[in-house]
Amino acid sequence: MKLTVIRTDCTNPYDNLAAEEYLTFHAEEDEMILFLWQNAHTVVIGKNQNPWRECNVEQIKADGVYLARRMSGGGAVYHDMGNLNFTFIARDGLYDISRQTDVILLACRLIGINAEKTGRNDLTADGKKFSGHAYYSSHGFNYHHGTIMMNVSGDDLPRYLNVSESKLQSKGVASVKSRVTNLMDQIPEDRLKKICGPEGKTSEKTRTKKAVREMQDALIRAAEREYGCSAVQADLPEIPQDLKDKYASEEWRFGTRIPFSKMIEHRFDWGGVEIQLNMRGEYIESCRLYSDSLETDLFPQIEELLPGCKYDASEILGLRLPQGASAAGYEILELIASSVE
């Protein structure tokens, strides 16, 4: 196999997400690409999330923060230059979420941190989250990406992100800040001083930059051990402008809003869902579904299925999703049916 490492100095989230998509669909048959990148002051939401509910959009605009939407599912995250993003890109056969996660865990051990996988897609150190993962697959092409919080501004997380009470309760925590940690706070003091220089004598910006670079190097070494081959460093190829424009567009980032007269919200084990129904008499004329679920294709399928259906429990329960749809789809239909008075 071939292990390709691509690092970029670009900090524009639209360009980076475009690069990630381009690399995904241009990976060779027996190639694992490790893409390492950072975004400057950015809120990134999942494929099916509602930006108006997940983020403080007005504050984001006022502060000149980027708002971006990715192709994968999951929840909203905040990126700054204290955060490192990674993406494992591979075709079916080589793509293995468990092995890729092991690379991250090994990289943490290489810099002196005992980390572990918890929940559906998080990594923790000392019981606190420092890395969240999400996934995308299409026709045999796949990516597994995530964040690694090295020294992210804790004050900016609650400033730009709105986290629902139900989500916090499901995690058993009181606030976003209480459930996350920066790895610079977890690296043993002597090791941190060696990596970043003494605190007080080196600027925080410089120390953070050195810590991020150390984690990048650790990830590369860990990937080489996991896959048993030497990494080949490569430059980022030219990314088509229309792909960059897609990620920067209002249409992609905010989506289409509909007028609605009914809204249903619920948190399942697999994630939260917000359902907006636009009614015409007794029938559903249109609908929008938002979710932080890791699934991506299910919600557009339900949006196509419901219009024209009578708002009646038996009619809704009689609908059939495409073959292969997950059980979560029928849980959503049951939820909508139960809302009928």
What are these regions (language model features)?
Residues 231, 235, 241-290:
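Internal helical hairpin/lid segments
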Residues 131, 139-257, 297-341:
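Long, positively charged amphipathic alpha-helical accessory segments at protein N-termini or as interdomain linkers
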Residues 1-95:
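N-terminal lobe of the biotin/lipoate ligase/transferase fold
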Residues 72-85, 123-126, 134, 138-142:
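FAD-binding core of FAD-dependent oxidoreductases
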Residues 39-40, 80-81, 125-127, 138-139, ...:
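Short acidic-glycine loop/turn motifs at beta-strand connectors
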Residues 85-135, 147:
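A generic, well-ordered mixed alpha/beta core segment in the N-terminal half of proteins
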